[in-house]
């Protein structure tokens, strides 16, 4: 029975150590990304907009179009952008 506990303990330790290594790698990558944003900012680019562009690029084209349409609808409802002209108005 003690062998079973030893095996489980070893497996648990291995999982924990793998997770810790991955967390360290994740932090290193996050620091690298932060450095790239800083570099872009020093070249005159807006980091907030860069993040938005990256977010948009991750989206599926159909999903992005749907979100843009909903956003336009909301902005029109709030009077923040003019309503799209319909064919009936012509």
From Swiss-Prot:
Q: Which InterPro entries match?
A: GapR-like, GapR-like_DNA-bd
Q: Which GO terms describe its molecular function?
A: DNA binding
Residue ranges annotated as transmembrane are: none
State the family named in the UniProt similarity comment for this chain. Answer: Belongs to the UPF0335 family.
The protein's name is: UPF0335 protein Smed_2680
Species this chain originates from: Sinorhizobium medicae (strain WSM419)
């Amino acid at each position: 029975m003690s062998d079973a506990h030893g095996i489980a303990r070893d497996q648990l330790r291995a999982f924990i150590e793998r997770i810790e290594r991955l967390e360290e790698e994740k932090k290193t990558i996050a620091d690298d990304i932060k450095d790239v944003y800083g570099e872009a900012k020093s070249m005159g680019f807006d980091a907030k907009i860069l993040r938005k562009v990256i977010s948009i690029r991750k989206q599926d084209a159909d999903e992005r179009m749907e979100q843009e349409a909903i956003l336009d609808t909301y902005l029109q409802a709030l009077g923040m952008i003019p309503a799209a002209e319909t064919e009936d108005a012509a």
